[in-house]
A protein has these predicted regions:
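A short glycine-rich, His/Asp/Glu-containing loop-to-beta-strand
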Residues: 1-33, 40
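Jelly-roll (double-stranded beta-helix
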Residues: 6, 32, 49, 59-62, ...
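Short secondary-structure boundary/capping segments
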Residues: 11, 34-35, 42, 58-59, ...
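Short acidic-glycine-tyrosine-enriched beta hairpin
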Residues: 7, 55-71
Length: 92
């Protein structure tokens, strides 16, 4: 499960939803939880490393890396190196 910290919950009529997301490390054989939702998503890794799987394609993102993608596609994240990963996610 991912932990979400909303950065704009009190802002009325917003066009984007920014979150700090924390993903704890899991056993390597545990499957990734996939999600999809309307719109687009921007992710910026703040701490750690993660594998981001989008529509069956796996990408490794390191601290400082970012990605912008169509969030209608099934996507899921996994922390790497046995350490948690924290990233900024902006959903539009």
């Amino acid at each position: 499960a991912y932990k979400y910290q909303s950065l704009a919950a009190g802002f009325m009529n917003r066009n984007a939803d920014p979150f700090i997301v924390t993903v704890e490390p899991k056993p390597n054989d545990e499957p990734i939880h996939y999600n999809s939702h309307s719109g687009q998503e921007f992710n910026l890794v703040l701490e750690g490393r993660m594998m981001l799987s989008i529509d069956g394609k796996d990408l490794i993102l390191n601290e400082g890396d970012s990605l912008y993608f169509n969030s209608k596609l099934p996507h899921g994240m996994k922390a790497l190196d046995g350490k948690k990963v924290r990233f900024l996610a902006v959903i539009m």
